[in-house]
């Protein structure tokens, strides 16, 4: 029985090594190796941000038109710089737009007023949706409420702000919901 097993194994192994026809050189497609002249740049990617002064001015104008004169805005694109082999930045690839607001308030203890102000800011940002700003992804919103030297800082994803309002959060509840993100 052992002889038959060895014979069968030898037969199978020899069948696996049967010669195959060699493909003709003409049947293998020739492809060009991409080079720098083709528009491709080899990059070392590094995280980076770039200010968006035009978008900042548009959002600031919308805030002022809504009567929110105590609010300052800074919009920036977040993404990656393409660093060439010589160490120079070839280009920037935006992934998202982040918005940072600074709000001067009388008191940080009036959560209803802070929540109302936050909701007004989010309503204005609805006019600047993802797709109309640099980058394919929804970014983040940072809000810093300042009263004298005291601050209350919020940092949340744009989608979380939209979701909280869709769930019916307003005023104090909206502030608390987004403060815990």
Regions found by a protein language model. Name each.
Residues 12-15:
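C-terminal motif of bacterial Sec signal peptides marking the signal peptidase cleavage site
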Residues 43, 48, 54-106, 131-181:
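Polar/charged, Gly/Pro-rich intrinsically disordered segments
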Residues 1-4:
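Positively charged n-region of N-terminal signal peptides that target proteins for export
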Residues 111-134:
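Short, non-transmembrane amphipathic alpha-helical segments
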Residues 25-47:
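Post-signal peptide N-terminal segment of mature Sec-exported envelope proteins
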Residues 17-19:
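Bacterial signal peptide processing site
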Residues 6-9:
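Sec-dependent N-terminal signal peptides
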